[in-house]
Amino acid sequence: MRKLFYIACMLCVASIASAQEINCTVTINSDQIEGSNKQVYETLKTSIQEYMNSNRWTNMSYAEQEKIECSMLIVVKEAADNMYKCEMTLQSRRPVWGTTYTTPLLNFVDRNFNFTYQEFDRLDWQQNTFTTNLTAMLAYYCYLIIGHDQDSFQRLGGTPFFQACEEIVNTCQSASMESSEQKGWLAFDSNRNRYALINNLLDEAFKKYRNFYYEYHRLGLDEMSGNVTNGRARIAQGLPVLKEAYRSRPATYVIGTFLDAKADELVDIFHKGTDKEKKEVYDLLMDIDATRQTTYDRINN
């Protein structure tokens, strides 16, 4: 487990250094784009991977085996005059204590991953300074990945990284960019975008959810390697927090992103539970996430 650290010392300006935090595999799918220079996508993929994996985003020490494993799939929908309109899926995970299992932390889809890029453009990040929308989005997601990872190891441990995301949102809202690039940063644009997610995560109203997120991982999953029954019971005990948050704000984005990452895992955990656990968990999940009924039905199979 990573050592506890003081929040005031967590962040630093991203710089090229050793002990980087992220190990991200990037895939770019340009199948929908015909008759274009396909080499540009290979160059872009390499540049994004180097940007995410070579920059040091915090002042914490990460051993090689502690790097956060993640993947990014970018599907190019439109490309013209160095403007790319894409959909991006980001997944991150972390190991569960005492097992070979890795648990998903993020399974996030950004449907407005839009940016301007010319082949061989250098991707540089300067904190609190807007350079390009691409570098801003990538930095936002690096901090989002680290924030979720830290929240899973320490109560509210991701706060400074979510605050870094918020700073990027604020910077981008006032930056000059193409209208298609603005999508995702603006409060009125959608209740399911980059702005909405980080606004939820830093909202005092969702502190109970973030405490549950920690307990789910450290006191639930990590406990299950030694005592499956106790770990599962601890997760079941905390799940009503999701229902409470959903009922207070049905349009809450963060609860949806949690279930996007955890729905299958919850099924795997509770289909081996007691009859009481199965019923309570199934009823709760169907109450807040009925669109995934087919998935949750497997709890009772």
List the model feature ranges, each with a label.
Residues 27, 213-301:
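A cross-kingdom marker for long, charged
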